Amino acid sequence: MENKLIELIETYNDFPRKGIEFKDVLGIIQEPKIFKELILKMSSSQIIRNAEAIISIDARGFIFGSAISLEASKPMIVARKPGKLPGELSKKKYSLEYGENSLSIQKKCLQKYNSYAIVDDLLATGGTVSCVSKLLESNGKEVLGLLVVVELMKLKGRFKLKFPVESSITF
């Protein structure tokens, strides 16, 4: 399956900024059989099985997190960029490979569950995932691990995290 996935991921040089090699995973969802195979694989992870809930990261993480949530019968909450969520929020700023941003989680969503699997499309520097884990931990929650479709190994994001990382493809 790995070779099939690699063929479906397109690289865009100098996007969104000069010097960045953007890996576009959206080709995967255009191939339902491969997408399903990927979701079945990710859903069977011990990290997913042991977590009470899934937290997906804005925006492409929602695609994979939603599908995994359905397949694994796990609730899903979202970590969103500024101005996208109503209500009382838990917020944190983070650094990206190409800038700075912040993420928010609705506090009421965090009340029901104590252990989480983080799902995103890609792991680069680890800044986004680290932000989500710190948000969860600051609310007394446990992060069991991270599942991503793509991991950019040269950026060493996994080494900044204190929990297991499972990636379907590495570049």
Curated annotation (Swiss-Prot):
UniProt GO BP: adenine salvage; AMP salvage; purine ribonucleoside salvage
Gene Ontology MF annotations: adenine binding; adenine phosphoribosyltransferase activity; AMP binding
Assigned EC number: 2.4.2.7
Enzyme class label: transferase
Annotated keywords: Cytoplasm, Glycosyltransferase, Purine salvage, Transferase
Biological pathway: Purine metabolism; AMP biosynthesis via salvage pathway; AMP from adenine: step 1/1
Recorded catalytic activity of this chain's protein: AMP + diphosphate = 5-phospho-alpha-D-ribose 1-diphosphate + adenine
Matches recorded under SUPFAM superfamilies: PRTase-like
Subcellular localization(s) per the UniProt record: Cytoplasm
Highest taxon of the lineage: Bacteria
GO cellular component annotations of the record: cytoplasm
Protein family membership: Belongs to the purine/pyrimidine phosphoribosyltransferase family.
Job description of the protein: Catalyzes a salvage reaction resulting in the formation of AMP, that is energically less costly than de novo synthesis.
Quaternary structure and partners: Homodimer.
Listed name of the protein: Adenine phosphoribosyltransferase
Organism, as annotated: Prochlorococcus marinus (strain MIT 9515)
Lineage: Bacteria, Bacillati, Cyanobacteriota, Cyanophyceae, Synechococcales
